[in-house]
């Protein structure tokens, strides 16, 4: 234990002690093969340090509070999308990610870059030290290749354009050795090719994990590899990776059962569904600096991030959907229905917070709804078709409510009375996917890859290859677990095609897990953010919005001279 502590201290001290460094000046002699070879378990201790640093608060330019890689990763990967509502302005740098107001000096932008490359350096040390011809080294080498591939993937998806925008676009610097070298931004295609090679080698080297899901395994490497192939539009390869991971097992056999799925994220590190997570222990509770604090209050959290209205409409097509157990509306208990009308932002200030007008519902008993506006006039509520079909209540899965309110087309929601955030007119609807491990509202082991995603990777790949039957088979495994009706080729329940079915199922199943923003960008699909909140009231077109990629951190590009991303 004393030896392990020494190695962890060296590893973490090395990674975190250079908060102002850039890739050119990072010292390559702090931890080397000679040090590793002093102890047979040296590589194991170093890999444990790689996992630990992803959850620890780290110093970046003198600031450590709330500065966790995993927290920042979910801010940067999830908050620019259309699944979240930012309930108000905040001083947390999550605001800039949500509002497309990123700068190269933000701590989340700089910390994630710094920590990712420190982890990559550590994995390179292990890879250069261990003899891969020795069977006893295979597992740890596989872990090192896995983490190197995963870190490069995180960097490539955040700081470079999607692969689907072109292989020759500027990617991120590739680091495949500990040798000092001039920093250049490799093309996107080269970066993805290296990620594939690393994950393939990881899958070949690893077997079962060394412990809980906080340690990667063969299936974790194949799962992330299927994601990478999907992003690269290599659909046959994506399918092959998923089928290799399944190894003949039925897709639904890999999922957490319906009965226990509401507790899945609280128990992620021991669930059979989790392929890799950032494992946390009780001692890792970060309180208000935790990932969960962004989504939940429960006495301690900030609870500033709520589900978006369009996503709520999608869930509410099937109120029995077990996935709604992760959504916690703060009902007031007052009788009667309320109308929540989104007031569009003004053309002169689209960045200003856009709010809801909240009032009581008027129901004439004949299925006609209306409300009284702040001007004293009564406004009719229109049921608008979605996916080509409007259905009557209570089934009603394919409609939204709208109203022409004071000359504006406004999205309307009807619900029981929900407590509003203090000082604002945004209903408080918390999210619990990052909470309640060991009963602690601020503790979880955030999931990086799970079978639910992997099956939907295969579903999308099959659909894009024209194999609708197989695509629906995988989608239906997810929907059956959710406890909601499945699809057939003859009944897509209002959808025009199976691709749209898959994309909405990905949105429902993987909400707030860091996938939706990437899914929309790689497919060049618009994100409609015209709903209440502090995020800009606009449609984000990934083909036109430069800020779908983050800036290269200031302390990197100003020293190494690598090219900054456009728009910064």
Identify what each model region corresponds to.
Residues 21-73, 486, 530-568:
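Membrane-proximal, proline-rich intrinsically disordered regions
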Residues 279-281, 287-293, 300-302, 441, ...:
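Long, intrinsically disordered, low-complexity segments
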């Amino acid at each position: 234990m004393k030896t392990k502590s020494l190695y962890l201290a060296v590893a973490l001290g090395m990674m975190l002690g250079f908060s102002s460094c850039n890739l050119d000046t990072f010292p390559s002699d702090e931890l080397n093969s000679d040090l590793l070879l002093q102890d047979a378990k040296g590589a194991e201790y170093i890999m444990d340090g790689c996992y630990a640093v992803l959850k620890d608060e780290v110093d970046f330019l003198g600031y450590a509070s709330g500065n966790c890689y995993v927290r920042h990763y979910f801010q940067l990967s999830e908050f620019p999308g259309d699944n979240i509502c930012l309930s108000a302005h905040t001083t947390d740098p999550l605001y800039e990610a949500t509002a497309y107001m990123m700068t190269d000096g933000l701590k989340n932008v700089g910390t994630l870059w710094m920590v990712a490359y420190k982890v990559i350096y550590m994995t390179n040390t292990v890879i250069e030290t261990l003899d891969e011809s020795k069977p006893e080294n295979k597992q740890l080498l596989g872990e090192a290749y896995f983490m190197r591939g995963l870190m490069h993937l995180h960097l490539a998806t955040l700081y470079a354009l999607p692969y689907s925008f072109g292989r020759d676009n500027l990617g991120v610097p590739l680091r495949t050795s500990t040798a000092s070298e001039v920093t250049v931004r490799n093309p996107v295609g080269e970066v993805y090719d290296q990620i594939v090679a690393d994950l393939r080698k990881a899958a070949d080297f690893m077997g079962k994990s060394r412990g809980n899901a906080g340690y990667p395994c063969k299936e974790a490497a194949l799962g992330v590899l299927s994601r990478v192939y999907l992003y690269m539009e290599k659909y046959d390869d994506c399918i092959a990776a998923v089928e290799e991971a399944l190894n003949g097992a039925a897709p639904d056999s890999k999922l957490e059962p319906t009965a226990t799925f509401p507790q899945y994220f609280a128990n992620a590190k021991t669930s059979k569904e989790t392929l890799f997570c950032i494992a946390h222990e009780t001692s890792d509770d970060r309180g208000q600096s935790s990932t969960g604090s962004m989504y939940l209050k429960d006495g301690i959290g900030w609870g500033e991030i709520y589900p978006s209205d369009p996503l709520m409409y999608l869930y509410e097509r099937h109120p029995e959907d077990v996935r709604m157990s992760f959504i916690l509306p703060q009902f007031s208990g007052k009788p009667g229905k309320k109308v929540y009308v989104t007031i569009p932002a003004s053309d002169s200030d689209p960045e200003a917070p856009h709010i809801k007008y909240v009032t009581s519902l008027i129901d004439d008993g004949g299925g006609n709804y209306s409300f009284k506006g702040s001007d004293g006039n009564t406004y009719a509520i229109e049921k608008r078709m979605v996916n080509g079909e409007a259905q009557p209540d209570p089934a009603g899965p394919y409609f939204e409510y709208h109203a022409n309110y004071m000359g504006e087309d406004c999205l309307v929601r009807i619900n029981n009375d929900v407590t509003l955030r203090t000082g604002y007119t945004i209903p408080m609807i918390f999210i619990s996917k990052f909470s309640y491990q060991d009963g602690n509202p601020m503790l979880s082991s955030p999931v990086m890859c799970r079978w639910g995603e992997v099956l939907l990777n295969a579903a999308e790949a099959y659909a894009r290859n024209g194999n609708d039957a197989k695509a629906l088979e995988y989608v239906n495994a997810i929907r059956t677990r959710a406890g909601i009706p499945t699809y057939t080729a003859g009944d897509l329940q209002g959808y025009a095609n199976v691709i749209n079915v898959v994309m909405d199922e990905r949105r429902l199943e993987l909400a707030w897990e860091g996938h939706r923003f990437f899914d929309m960008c790689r497919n060049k699909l618009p994100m409609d953010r015209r709903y209440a909140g502090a995020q800009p009231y606009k449609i984000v077109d990934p083909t036109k919005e430069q800020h779908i990629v983050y800036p290269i951190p200031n302390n990197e590009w100003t020293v190494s001279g690598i090219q900054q991303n456009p728009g910064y």
